[in-house]
A protein has these predicted regions:
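Short, contiguous clusters of charged residues that form electrostatic/catalytic patches at enzyme active sites
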Residues: 5-9, 96-99
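Structured catalytic cores of enzymes that bind and process phosphorylated ligands/cofactors
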Residues: 4, 20, 46, 78, ...
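Hydrophobic structural elements of the Rossmann-like NAD(P)H-binding subdomain
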Residues: 24, 66-69, 79
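Catalytic loop of short-chain dehydrogenase/reductase
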Residues: 6, 12-60, 73
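C-terminal helical subdomain
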Residues: 68-69, 76, 84-121
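Short, charged low-complexity linear motifs
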Residues: 60-66
Length: 121
């Protein structure tokens, strides 16, 4: 969380100088769905979402587009460790998620702290 805060503060002025810049942050549905044994992860994602939304509100009068993306269930090492035995064939691959994120980035839409669910894109 602190690294994201420092990144925002370091890049804020530069992003504002650009004609049309975008900032994208990866979150998780865990930010709003409390689950047992996921406390630190869920808290960090909830705090990230809140911090990014505050930053978006601070930039509501310029062209800086600020997005939060929930990639959804993705076949990663973290997920395999957390969910052993889960059928990976029903999960998105990281490459599929990345392609959707790239498409989202290139939409001609200014976002002000919206949360985009990759599974719905």
């Amino acid at each position: 969380l602190l690294s994201n805060h420092r990144l925002i503060r370091s890049m804020d002025a530069l992003l504002k100088k650009s004609t049309f810049s975008k900032a994208l942050f990866l979150s998780s549905s865990m930010a709003s769905t409390p689950k047992s044994f996921w406390g630190a992860y869920a808290i960090s994602k909830a705090a990230l979402n809140h911090m990014v939304k505050i930053w978006a509100n601070e930039n509501k009068n310029n062209n800086l587009s600020i997005m939060i993306v929930n990639p959804g269930k993705t076949s990663t090492k973290m997920r395999a460790k957390a969910m052993p035995g889960e059928n990976e064939k029903v999960l998105q691959t990281p490459e599929e998620v990345a392609k959707k994120i790239v498409n989202l980035i290139f939409l001609n839409k200014v976002s002000k702290g919206e949360i985009f669910d990759i599974l719905q894109i």
